[in-house]
């Protein structure tokens, strides 16, 4: 074996030389130099420094401005809450453990950090699925009389929480487990071992199919149909400048959404699956650490792409930050008016 398996941990280094120690008790500087751990801590500090204000501001601005309290924005608020789960439950812990070079909070701390970080990530992932379904239903109108209302939004939020709990609770009760991963400073699902009594194999397959491939398929289908619908609407109104502008805007948003999804989750899912299907193969701690931290960065991508590019929200945010006045009032007002015109031209295809 090219790694060292112990009680509730797996260190990606052979213990032939006798240097491997428990990641709950000793610094892991034999895996990477201290400066590498310092870089991880600095990166987590950056995510906290950016992720907390942006997501908190999203919550505050939406609550402060009544016109933003729409059913669709319930999902966007839930997205911000999911990102804050990652910031407080995962990033703060990982920053502190990286500064120490090992997981100082022990087994209980590993369970809590793994749960909160995974819960936030999976919850936000299913929020994106609900958003894509909402956009598909509203724009493509597969059900002609359907109107997305408050009850639908509440059901959507409840669905994201149910799916997140369905992924994060089982490792706490014996179906798989949370263990330190990569450089042993953060915890995640055990993709590394086939430890007796935990049924890791079945859980990893379940997680990969239900919580990665399924969201990927749904998002691809919904946004693919959205692009086709916008193109059809533009083709019928070729002389309408606002329609053409709406097509470009929605297409850009779709591309950004899809790229962000892939950047955040494809590397992590791919590496996890490779490790799972090639157990016993040699790999270094950085091999798992880098994609895991790509996934954590979704707490920044989400509010920027899904909220800050929304003209109406941006106007309200600037007004809030500038104590009730928007110094770009004329420009923002014109953009908002144009956005409304575009929305009416192509059946409300604007991002939100």
Curated annotation (Swiss-Prot):
A motif ('Ionic lock' involved in activated form stabilization) lies at residues 134-136. GO terms for biological process: absorption of visible light; G protein-coupled opsin signaling pathway; visual perception. Gene3D superfamilies: Rhodopsin 7-helix transmembrane proteins. Changing residue 261 to F: Decrease of absorbance minimum from 504 to 496 nm. SUPFAM superfamilies: Family A G protein-coupled receptor-like (SSF81321). It is found in: Membrane; Cell projection, Cilium, Photoreceptor outer segment. Residues 331-352 are annotated as: Disordered. A lipid is attached at residues 322-323 (S-palmitoyl cysteine). Residues 334-352 have a biased composition (Low complexity). Glycans are attached at residues 2, 15. Residues 1-36, 97-110, 174-202, 275-286 are extracellular. Disulfide bonds join 110-187. One of its GO terms (molecular function) is G protein-coupled photoreceptor activity. Coiled coil: none annotated. Photoreceptor required for image-forming vision at low light intensity. While most salt water fish species use retinal as chromophore, most freshwater fish use 3-dehydroretinal, or a mixture of retinal and 3-dehydroretinal. Light-induced isomerization of 11-cis to all-trans retinal triggers a conformational change that activates signaling via G-proteins. Subsequent receptor phosphorylation mediates displacement of the bound G-protein alpha subunit by arrestin and terminates signaling. This is Rhodopsin. The gene is rho.
